[in-house]
From Swiss-Prot:
Function, in words: Part of the phosphoribosylformylglycinamidine synthase complex involved in the purines biosynthetic pathway. Catalyzes the ATP-dependent conversion of formylglycinamide ribonucleotide (FGAR) and glutamine to yield formylglycinamidine ribonucleotide (FGAM) and glutamate. The FGAM synthase complex is composed of three subunits. PurQ produces an ammonia molecule by converting glutamine to glutamate. PurL transfers the ammonia molecule to FGAR to form FGAM in an ATP-dependent manner.
Gene that specifies this protein: purQ
Keyword Hydrolase recorded: yes
Reaction it catalyzes: N(2)-formyl-N(1)-(5-phospho-beta-D-ribosyl)glycinamide + L-glutamine + ATP + H2O = 2-formamido-N(1)-(5-O-phospho-beta-D-ribosyl)acetamidine + L-glutamate + ADP + phosphate + H(+); L-glutamine + H2O = L-glutamate + NH4(+)
Keywords: ATP-binding, Cytoplasm, Glutamine amidotransferase, Hydrolase, Ligase, Nucleotide-binding, Purine biosynthesis
Organism ancestry: Bacteria, Pseudomonadati, Pseudomonadota, Alphaproteobacteria, Hyphomicrobiales
Protein source organism: Rhizobium meliloti (strain 1021) (Ensifer meliloti)
Protein name: Phosphoribosylformylglycinamidine synthase subunit PurQ
Matches recorded under SMART domains: GATase_5 (SM01211)
Location of the protein in the cell: Cytoplasm
Functional pathway: Purine metabolism; IMP biosynthesis via de novo pathway; 5-amino-1-(5-phospho-D-ribosyl)imidazole from N(2)-formyl-N(1)-(5-phospho-D-ribosyl)glycinamide: step 1/2
Length: 223
């Protein structure tokens, strides 16, 4: 499968994401700049982490209004898989591709550490390599990862299986409601998550717990 990594001013995890996608699929992803109005024929689009536009206004608010986002929305409507990690998650929420909002961490501090994630839904295009209830490790590094949604939205996403990852008990780093760490859109082809799976894909680098997400999304589960 072919993949693309979106590049915007201030994003600084694009190289990590490119390395992860290349390692898992054996093919280097194409890169797409913020001003592009068309995206090549790919199967997976990734918006990596960082601090797009310095996080001014709100995290992801300016990036969500760049020309490339209209192209991403069009691809998502066609069923192309879209993954947003950390700032990428914030951008997808600001663009209206995912429900909820991401607020300042409850501690009011930047958090950079490893957490444990529970795989809540293993029957998705992004989690088929995992088992439901499996607990995996993943790094986090963010200041505004506190996921919030109103009661009606929470009921809907919990009931529809759109909550994909939850911080394991006692490891919630930011105060996210219901310990939510990653959510899908209703269609199931757009995933946003605050943790960084791209930083744990090789045992030599501390672990490979994140590998399953990319293997699932790229249809290379046996990789």
């Amino acid at each position: 499968m072919k993949s693309a990594v979106v590049q915007l001013p201030g994003l600084n995890r694009d190289c990590d994401m490119i390395a992860a996608l290349t390692k898992i699929s054996g093919k280097a992803p194409v890169t797409v700049w913020q001003t592009e109005t068309e995206i090549p024929d790919v199967d997976l689009i990734v918006i990596p982490g960082g601090f797009s536009y310095g996080d001014y206004l709100r995290c992801g608010a300016i990036a969500a209004r760049m020309p490339v986002m209209q192209a991403i929305k069009a691809k998502a409507e066609q069923g192309v898989r879209v993954l947003g990690v950390c700032n990428g998650f914030q951008i997808l929420v600001e663009a209206g591709l995912l429900p909820g909002a991401l607020m300042r961490n409850a501690s009011l501090k930047f958090v950079c550490r490893e957490v444990k994630l529970e795989v809540v839904n293993a029957d998705t295009a992004f989690t088929r390599a995992y088992a439901k209830g499996q607990v995996i490790r993943s790094p986090v590094a963010h200041h505004d990862g506190n996921y919030f949604a109103d009661a009606e939205t929470l009921k809907a996403i919990e009931g529809n299986g759109q909550v994909v990852f939850r911080y394991a008990e006692g490891t919630n780093p930011n105060g996210s409601v219901n310990d939510i760490a990653g959510v899908l859109n209703a269609k199931g082809n757009v995933l946003g998550m605050m943790p960084h799976p791209e930083n744990l894909i090789e045992s030599a680098h501390g672990g490979a717990d994140g590998r399953g997400l990319f293997a699932s999304a790229l249809d290379v589960i046996a990789a």
